[in-house]
Every structure is written in C-alpha cells, then in structure tokens.
C-alpha cells in the first residue's frame, strides 16, 4: 500500500543488509535470505537541482540579508535513502528562503541514487564504498580513489564552511527514530535543541570508518561547528519522510531562519539522552540475535542474552540497556548493535 504526505505545498507519493549478507557468504557461512521490504516512496526528479549554484554538483545555497549561521541540510549520503531527497526536493520546489544566515541544501551520492531500483532497493546504498565511512583527514587527504571518496572530496570545501549540519538518514531494520550526535559536546547541544525525534544518542561511530558527524571540524575541542545525523525511521516508508521534515523544521526554527516561530501549543517534551558504552562488532560470519530486537527497545535486566557471535555470548552490561539500531544481517567486521545507557 502507498500513502501520500503533503508538506511545503508538495505532495509525496509514495545495501547495508546486502553487503553484510555477502560478507557472511564470503566468510563461508550462509546468511539467511533477506526479507522483501515495502517501498512506499518514489525517487524524486532531482534534475532541476543538479547544477546547483555553489560549484559543487547537487548543492544549492541561499543567503539572507541578515547575518546568522550557515546551515547545511544533507541528503543521500546513502543513495537508496529516498526520504531525505524527497524533503530537500520539496524545499527547493517551495522556494523556501532563510530569513537570516545561509541555508545550503545538498544531495551527496547522486551516482548511487541514479541506480535506485524499487525491485532491489538495498543495492544502491553506494557504488564502491560507504560514503559515511570516509570522513577522517587521513583518508580524505590520501591517495586512495573511489567514487564515494572522490565525491566526499568534492563536498569537503562546503563542509569546511558550515556551522551546523543536519544529515538525513533512514534505517533498513525496524527502529524508533533517533538523533545521533557523535562524541562532540557542540553536536550534543544541537541535537538536544532540535528535539525531534525525542531520543538523542551519543556514540563514537563504527570500526569501519568515520562518519560525517565524526569529521574533525565538528568534534574538535575548539570551534563552533556542530553536526547531527537523524535516523528518521525505516527506508522507503512515508512516516520517515514526515519525521525528517519535522527535524528540518525544528533546526530551521532553532537557527532563526523561518519567519514564523514554532507552535508552542504542541511543544514536545525534552528528548531523552543516552550514551553508547559498547559497540558490538561481529567477529565471525555467524552473528545472530536470539530474537528480532527492535531499535529503541530497552532491555530491563543486566546479563540478558542478546546474541551469539560464533561461540561467544553477547549480554546486556547493565539494567535498562538501550538497543541502538540492531542489524539483523551482520557480516564479520560490521556493527551489529550499539548498547547505550540513559543519563
């Protein structure tokens, strides 16, 4: 079933699992067959926005007469995550302009997005490598080449000018939406100020590489820049687009970029904050949860069995343990789940 969603005057109709499964097969253990995922969204026509106005393909920037922060809203770090592209396309078509500061809207992995196929929607996450694992200076400054790394280098000069980034993402497996703020205090403050979705999680990222929110500009002890990643819901689902739009609107209000203030009659409660204390990375090709945990699920008791990684048992390290984005098709070397404690 497809659904419709209207915002900013626009009506919307509506490969991480594959990569992990392939990894398991290469290691000699057959991963279970992936389920068939419902695709409620259609990829938007981004052709009007490809030229942009910044000198970087797919990036468009608008400056207001009044001074203010430079805010970047970024979509398509992963080419199959359509929700962010739909939100930015709607913003551009609505001719939204900031009332202060500078607003930049960017589509990152356009080449992977161009390969999206609703019959195989997980395959176009990236072409050569995950674009959200290349954001350390050594990799960006090094000699290695890939389509995603080359594109990150194209985008980097814009990243180096922005004050705040909201990176729009979605998830393959069922999970409550959340904001990820990395390890920086400024990014934590920005995520709490955005406030929607109502869960903020601080973490150190993945063993496989650095995310955009881990880029040194946003994590350095000095400076003012901050970056937040919203995981707005499942890929290709209409409510995910609605959550992205809510997060974008909240950030623009926080930046003072919209004429109208937020609706104080519907002000949500303050978000909960949790900090990841342990990243579970699969060490074998036989990692398996004992049941299909949902992201955002809180496990009441310390010592609860969560998974087996070969012969090793994975158990909760404390009471009220938050499950952050469990991946149910995990190959060796990939993040299986993050365990977090509320504070």
Located regions from the model:
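Structured catalytic-domain cores with a bias toward divalent-metal coordination
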Residues: 2-343
């Amino acid at each position: 079933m497809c659904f419709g969603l209207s915002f900013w005057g626009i009506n919307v109709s509506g490969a991480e699992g594959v990569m992990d499964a392939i990894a398991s097969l290469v290691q000699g253990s057959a991963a279970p067959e992936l389920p068939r995922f419902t695709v409620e969204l259609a990829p938007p026509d981004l052709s009007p926005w490809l030229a942009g106005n910044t000198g970087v393909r797919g990036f468009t920037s608008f400056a207001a007469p009044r001074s203010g922060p430079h805010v970047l809203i970024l979509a398509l770090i992963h080419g199959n995550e359509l929700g962010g592209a739909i939100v930015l396309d709607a913003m551009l078509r609505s001719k939204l302009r900031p009332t202060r500061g500078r607003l930049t809207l960017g589509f990152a992995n356009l080449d992977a997005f161009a390969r999206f196929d609703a019959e195989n929607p997980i395959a176009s996450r990236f072409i050569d490598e995950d674009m959200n694992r290349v954001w350390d200076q050594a990799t960006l400054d090094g000699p290695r080449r890939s389509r995603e790394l080359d594109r990150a280098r194209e985008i980097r000069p814009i990243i180096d000018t922005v004050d705040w980034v909201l990176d729009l993402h979605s998830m393959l497996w069922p999970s409550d939406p959340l904001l990820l703020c990395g390890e920086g205090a400024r990014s934590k403050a920005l995520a709490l100020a955005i406030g929607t979705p109502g869960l903020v999680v601080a973490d150190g990222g993945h063993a496989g590489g650095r995310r955009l929110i881990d880029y040194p500009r946003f994590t350095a002890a000095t400076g003012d820049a901050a970056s937040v990643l919203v995981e707005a819901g499942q890929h290709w689902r209409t409510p995910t687009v609605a959550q992205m739009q809510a997060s974008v609107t909240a950030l623009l209000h926080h930046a003072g970029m919209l004429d109208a203030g937020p609706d104080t009659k519907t002000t949500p409660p303050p978000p909960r904050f949790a900090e990841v204390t342990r990243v579970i990375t699969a060490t074998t090709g036989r990692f398996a949860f004992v049941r299909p945990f949902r992201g955002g699920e809180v496990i009441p008791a310390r010592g609860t069995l969560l998974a087996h990684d070969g012969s090793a048992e994975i158990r909760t390290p404390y009471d009220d343990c938050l499950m952050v984005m469990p991946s149910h098709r995990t190959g060796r070397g990939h993040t299986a789940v993050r365990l977090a404690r509320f504070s």
